[in-house]
A protein has these predicted regions:
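Hydrophobic pocket-lining "lid/loop/helix" segments that shape and contact the acyl-thioester
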Residues: 1-67, 118-132
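Generic structural "secondary-structure junction" signal
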Residues: 4-6, 11-12, 68-71, 92, ...
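A short linear-motif detector with a strong N-terminal bias
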Residues: 16-19, 75-78, 89-92
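Buried hydrophobic packing segments
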Residues: 20-21, 51, 77-84
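Short active-site-adjacent structural elements
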Residues: 47-49, 74, 105-107
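Hydrophobic alpha-helical segments
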Residues: 54, 58, 69, 83-87, ...
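Active-site-adjacent helical/loop segments in soluble small-molecule enzymes
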Residues: 65-77
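Conserved beta-strand-centric core segments of catalytic alpha/beta enzyme folds
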Residues: 81-132
Length: 132
């Protein structure tokens, strides 16, 4: 039968997310912990917290929505970005570090600088975000 190697997947997720984020940050001339926001694939809280601890990221800079939505697969980072945008916490000039992993043991990360202002009427659900 088919079996998932849970510990192997956990180790891959934590190590690849951390390495990918560090490589992207290094290319940008910064450390991951300097990003205003770090958005990870919302697989489970244990992975998210392990990556956060490994990189020394302030929990207040790593929002999560897995408590509300569960693991939404490849949509988790875009949905988390949507929630952050609509919370009113994301502001022009902020740097975001994004990381995801998934099928076939693939992973990737990038850094972006946000420049879109948040209209006041969209600032409606900051309370839906928790922090790792």
């Amino acid at each position: 039968g088919i079996r998932m190697q849970g510990q192997e997947v956990f180790r891959f997720a934590v190590s690849s997310s951390a390495k990918d984020l560090q490589a992207a940050a290094e290319e940008a001339g910064m450390q991951v912990a300097q990003a205003d926001w770090v958005l990870l694939h919302q697989a489970n809280m244990r992975i998210i917290q392990s990556v956060r601890q490994r990189l020394g990221v302030d929990p207040a800079r790593m929002p999560t929505n897995i408590h509300r939505l569960g693991n939404t697969s490849s949509a988790s980072v875009p949905m988390l970005l949507y929630d952050l945008y609509h919370s009113g916490l994301l502001q022009p000039g902020h740097t975001l570090a994004l990381s995801a992993f998934g099928a076939g043991m693939t992973s990737g990360a990038c850094l972006i600088r946000w420049d879109k202002p948040v209209p006041h009427e969209l600032r409606d659900h900051a309370e839906t975000l928790f922090f790792a």
